[in-house]
From Swiss-Prot:
GO terms (BP aspect): nuclear capsid assembly; proteolysis; viral release from host cell
Source organism phylogeny: Viruses, Duplodnaviria, Heunggongvirae, Peploviricota, Herviviricetes
Name of this chain's protein: Capsid scaffolding protein
The family this protein is said to belong to: Belongs to the herpesviridae capsid scaffolding protein family.
Sequence motif Nuclear localization signal 1, location on chain: 510-515
HAMAP family, per the entry: HSV_SCAF
Compositionally biased intervals (Low complexity): 284-293, 326-339, 593-615
Region described as Interaction with pAP: spans on this chain: 333-352
Amino acid sequence: MTMDEQQSQAVAPVYVGGFLARYDQSPDEAELLLPRDVVEHWLHAQGQGQPSLSVALPLNINHDDTAVVGHVAAMQSVRDGLFCLGCVTSPRFLEIVRRASEKSELVSRGPVSPLQPDKVVEFLSGSYAGLSLSSRRCDDVEAATSLSGSETTPFKHVALCSVGRRRGTLAVYGRDPEWVTQRFPDLTAADRDGLRAQWQRCGSTAVDASGDPFRSDSYGLLGNSVDALYIRERLPKLRYDKQLVGVTERESYVKASVSPEAACVIKAASAERSGDSRSQAATPAAGARVPSSSPSPPVEPPSPVQPPALPASPSVLPAESPPSLSPSEPAEAASMSHPLSAAVPAATAPPGATVAGASPAVSSLAWPHDGVYLPKDAFFSLLGASRSAAPVMYPGAVAAPPSASPAPLPLPSYPASYGAPVVGYDQLAARHFADYVDPHYPGWGRRYEPAPSLHPSYPVPPPPSPAYYRRRDSPGGMDEPPSGWERYDGGHRGQSQKQHRHGGSGGHNKRRKETAAASSSSSDEDLSFPGEAEHGRARKRLKSHVNSDGGSGGHAGSNQQQQQRYDELRDAIHELKRDLFAARQSSTLLSAALPSAASSSPTTTTVCTPTSELTSGGGETPTALLSGGAKVAERAQAGVVNASCRLATASGSEAATAGPSTAGSSSCPASVVLAAAAAQAAAASQSPPKDMVDLNRRIFVAALNKLE
């Protein structure tokens, strides 16, 4: 295509089609709602009885009245929504779009393979991918249907924008209106026929420059483009609209789903194109020899993307490959804009290569557009090779010494003693930066000055007195370990040994007594029950023989074992006391239930009847009188334990042979004898003890029986 054909195609009208509203998609804002009945009523009212427009609506950019680029050729309400077909005819606007499309990398990639490249159409598809309708609000149906008021026209204009606010308002551009309508599968054949009749009646002739309605400029379009950059949901909404409309099923110039990031990838140029461009752009300096062979490829970067070949610098030309190198090992040559890099080709080039003049041009100091990737070691090796040639190329340049400064000696792990010679900070600094050798001290000196000595007039302080230990008990007790000794400083040397031994002024013993009194409390007292001999007296519990400091070693283990034994004994004694208390309570209840008044002592519950009552029973036998004792014996056999003995059932003959007691006596030897016999029989019938706790329990019960 020639230049004239491209210019004529650029000024040719461009058609754009798309939905202005979708009836099946509810908008996010209520003011954007366009019901079907309201739209059809407006079309009949504005089309003078026909469902079309009698007057063409203006087509502008981003609702800017000064940026009118064409007109609406057809508008019709179809099954899925309100569809329109516009025509872009502004020559000034199309010329701006043509010039901008030549600088776009995304447009230069071209469309999908079956489509013909058209930069103007592709630029419009990527920049203004949405349609927006400016109309009256239809929040109220009655107000929307009535055209009375200041605004009698329901539709004002249609705008080409970056993204529409309504769903499904995607714009499709093309040179043929029939091709544009075929991109939408939702349009039926009848819909396309109606749209065709409208645009043929409206006309689509090109507008001349004198009647161009576009009164804006490129700066206004640039401002609108900057505003479109702040739309956060632009790309997701365009992808959604593209799928909703169904444009993805057919070829189009829509760039909604194409990411511009892929266009930023650096393309690798071929050797022929790069060689031609370098031969045309580069101008060799005077006296420089142009190599006949093609330059070697640059160093491969770490990324998989191949960088383009670097253009030759005016002052430095790439060197020829030596004939001894194999094809698998090409020569590596790179040109850099750093002043020291001018001598790199001279140092690394083969003998047959020549270098440009002595001073570089000013233009060679500018950074090139493309860069070359070098490893760190290769970069430093190039700098090292250029040091020798830098003073020659640049008079007055000072080259750094090749050898690095020696590392300082390591610091000592501990400070030197006071007997070592004193080393000042000046000597240390000289030792850092020069080959300083101390003749007196080969290693490092200390960092601090020695401690200042006292004035000769001051007396010498006495040496510190050593601490000694003293026993807290009498000299006769030798079994206490040294850990129990008390330590006294030398300040107590003026007091007498006797005063130390007996507590001095009494402060130490006083503190010990206060500590003991604070540690002893009512919680250490053991429990006592009514009826016991020691009831009402404070009895201390058994304390564990554990050291106050917790003990250590074997002492801690033995103390722990003793503590466990004492805990077991204490638990057994408490169980016995609870059993005895329960037995006393039950015996008290039984004695209260007997027919005769019984005198009870605090240590026994055996019922005794006087002799006068036994003889004056009126024919009653002692067995009958002892019926209460028999009941007690039965309950004792059932599990009721008495504190004094276990009662057994006595026969009538044994009670008769016991004989009456003296009158007025409150004792009953017959019952005591029977109780003792029953206790012996019960003890004989018991099983042997099971363990040590059971044996201790029986011994304790026997001791209590003897006391009673």
